[in-house]
Amino acid sequence: MPDIKVTPLGAGQDVGRSCILVSIGGKNIMLDCGMHMGFNDDRRFPDFSYITQNGRLTEFLDCVIISHFHLDHCGALPYMSEMVGYDGPIYMTHPTKAICPILLEDFRKITVDKKGETNFFTSQMIKDCMKKVVPLNLHQTVQVDDELEIKAYYAGHVLGAAMVQIKVGSESVVYTGDYNMTPDRHLGAAWIDKCRPDILISESTYATTIRDSKRCRERDFLKKVHETVERGGKVLIPVFALGRAQELCILLETFWERMNLKAPIYFSTGLTEKANHYYKLFITWTNQKIRKTFVQRNMFEFKHIKAFDRSYADNPGPMVVFATPGMLHAGQSLQIFKKWAGNEKNMVIMPGYCVQGTVGHKILNGQKKLEMEGRATLDVKLQVEYMSFSAHADAKGIMQLIRMAEPRNMLLVHGEAKKMEFLKDKIEQEFSISCFMPANGETTTIVTNPSVPVDISLNLLKREMALGGPLPDAKRPRTMHGTLIMKDNSLRLVSPEQALKELGLNEHQLRFTCRVQLHDPHSDTDTLSRIYTHLKSVLKSYSIQHVPDGTVIVESIVIKVTSSAEEPNLKVILLSWSYQDEELGSFLSTLLKKGLPS
């Protein structure tokens, strides 16, 4: 039996370094190639030794697909292609292709130029890697080769994020990457058609969370920021360059304008300009409201939000700063946090998920003393708030996607083991499908039922529909009767009449014959007349004919009477019928065996 194998090289019962290997129909596809922000050694990269022991991946992989530009999904791409060795195609959407190299270069500068780390990719490697990228359009079916095809769907989450359907023959897999089932201030909700894949591989970051009202969260966020600046404190909001940053900037910009507030709001230098450029360039990826108003008013040109200079961090008085990256693991956000952590007037608001090992994760878990580089200890006195503006699907959203796609099997990645276990049970109970949650390096094998596509002739379809009843769908299948014709390796279901005509054949008639013996003193003609009268009284809804040639006809059934030569009173009744009337023929033979009424 054919099967599909799925092996997480990263993000198996874990969040970070997303990298899923899928083997389907003899093809090997790598889904995402991310980096783990909680590690500073080789553990930050996926373990490619599961694929091959002798280095290069080109001979093994048919293609690599990147779902979006976040570093936990694309951060290891130059390492994989240029240092381990891969020359094949890398697929991603146009916005991801544009933004991905900028974020990779920013992270490389922090890691290599500032921290002095070795065994890391260079600027040239990023450029060489991006030359291998093939851009994807939404809903466009791309033929990777003669057998493998891929198709991208809108995922929300961040600009350019996509879910991907992979098909080889009749087998298919859908990989969600990160997605969001609710629209926000700048992006739409994820959408996929009822593609019924053999496996749906879904993220499960918020596997046990059902978020409260977005409006309540926004109100709480604005209240906390306002209260902090009113008492003279500083607010740090760690964000990733594109995504939640724009969402919260639009929110604060509107609030500052309405309340006529004067406290300065800053954003990491350069990133606002870049964000603005890409949102203009890829306006079709934003939500309907922004697309409609973009010509008159660009939502991303902020009046109250200015570019940040590192010297501003020491300025007295209140301020709000959006700084990257979002998990406080490096860069400007971490530098500002170190400066402001000692003052209880200040506040840090964490708007998204933080992986284990990052400073963000530590302070959210209540750590008040942090060991920094060089064995220095940092006392955390500022207020720490977690407000989920994360653009990941919650438990409700994941269930909604399953209802949309109707997969035959489910596989969870990109989440914490305990939470995944809870969601796994819920999915199996509600949808009666198998759900898997493999750890890193663990292979899940799913046996598929090969389906054979069949074209149905229009005439046959019209005839079936004329019979009435509900239209067929996945939950209410309908049996269709016809003749299968195989020609040029394709199958068609047609009516038997059409099949005979196309093949130039004559229809054969299959008939059954039955003899019934009956004692009757009357002549053969009288006996036949009595049979006719009896059948007329029993079969009131049928057309019954008494033909002059000495036969009675009911539908296709022919009845004749002859006498036995040895015994004139013994009549032999001969019944003959076609296979369509087999049920009626059996009924009549049983009826006549009981005799005729006197």
Curated annotation (Swiss-Prot):
Annotated residues for binding of Zn(2+) 2: 72-73, 178, 414
EC number: 3.1.27.-
This protein's record includes keyword Metal-binding: yes
GO CC annotation terms, alphabetical: cytoplasm; INTAC complex; integrator complex; nucleus
Membrane recorded as keyword: no
Annotated active site: 203
Pfam family for this entry, one: IntS11_C
Motif stretch (HXHXDH motif): 68-73
One MF term in the entry's GO annotations: RNA endonuclease activity
UniProt function note: RNA endonuclease component of the integrator complex, a multiprotein complex that terminates RNA polymerase II (Pol II) transcription in the promoter-proximal region of genes.
Protein name: Integrator complex subunit 11
Species this chain originates from: Danio rerio
Top-level taxonomy: Eukaryota, Metazoa, Chordata, Craniata, Vertebrata
